[in-house]
Amino acid sequence: MDQVLSKVTTTAATYATAYAVRTGLQLAGSLVAKRFSKYIQTSAPKSSQFNLELVKSRLEQKIQAITPAVDLIQLVAARGNSSLQNLVPLIIRLRDHIDDFLEFIDYEASGSEKKSPEKADEASEKIFRRCEVLLREIEETIPLINLSLTTAGITLNTALSNTISPSRLLQAQCFLELSDKRFEESHTEIQIGPKFTVVLYTSFSQPSKSDGPLDVRWQETFAKSDLYIKRVVSASQKFSYVICIDEDLNDGRYHEETVGKPTSAPVFGKKLEISLQRMSLLCYTVSGRLLNISQAKSPVLALQLTSIKDVSALDKAHQDNSEDLNNPFIKNNDKTKFHQNIDWIALEKYFEVNALDISDSESEDLSDILSDSEFSIGNRNKNIGNNEYSAQISSDPAEEEIANAMHSLKLEPETSIYLTNPGSLSLLEYLLRLCSLQELHQISCLEMTDSQLAAMLNSN
């Protein structure tokens, strides 16, 4: 996979999802504060409430103070900084001790109404001493965190890179905010933003002729597909997202499934659902570098997928229903589990081929390329009318709501980049970034700090 990384020509942004799910302190700190406050108000003796309130405030302030540094350590360590990776077990242990303290509060609070005054005083004293121990542990951890960050030369930089597109970022955030609102109202699966018509590539490894590293190659998996992000209901997480990819067999090639069917309507084949937790790297390259075709210069958005132990319930269901572990897909029209040995996928914007604009010689060259299913670059056309985009926009309630809001502000849709190019890879990129950010911290992007947003949006 190092060979693939060496071919990446533009910037990359890393998502430390696996670490943050286990070690994030912000969520644990807020839970402790809520449970502690509830215990003080409902179960603690009045004589102990003042002292308990003091240690609770100190604990909450300490956790809030170290959370930005802990988040920074997790992100940098996940990117391969060996000097900070040694701190990750310390952070995990601190998180475990906070969870233990939370369970201890629940244990002492259970049946408190039946306890005698002496037992209630004893329970409050135990909680007070346990909180003091946790505070001392946090205070001992702070110098180690500061020393490691200073030694590694890591700082909290909130300045955004020049490559960040403010317009695309605002458009993606608008989609995300509308979908969050609809999700809170319906509590059902909600699509995030528009559908993107893309060509899907996947990587595979094969033994090299020498004893060197594996030879990593790419193949075209779906010549045409509809990709979208959806927010799903999760029992363990407030924010949980899935990348859905539906193959469209109406791609200009011969398929038995499309015989006798109208060419204007989509004919769906295989389906993929990939948990966003598996995404660890997001980067741009060009299709020719993946497929060893020098003439191909189309931009491609590449995603690295990791195998995580704490898979979501959706992933477990897919794994249990898999019919053939040696095949990344199961029967057509079934939701399938993306096979764990596929480390990368790449997405290229799909273009229709306009037969009227292709000469005979060009048609022969194009057919030669398209006939090679393993290394073909998909159908393309540089002329797509705005009517197709307008139809795509009007089909989504969230997009209609945006259009209505723009109309109320007297903004002309015809002059909007968003309306003239809703299926661009850059919009998909920012949707993936923001959704991953919300799933990472389990809070809305509107509630995040500058450092949290900058750490995810900045490229390295």
UniProtKB/Swiss-Prot annotation:
Pfam families reported in the protein's UniProt record: Ran-binding
Domain of life: Eukaryota
GO cellular component terms listed in the entry, alphabetical order: cytoplasm; cytosol; nucleus
Molecular function as annotated in GO: GTP binding; GTPase regulator activity
InterPro entries: Ran_GTP-bd-rel
Sequence similarity: To yeast YGL164c.
Protein name, per record: Uncharacterized protein C31A2.10
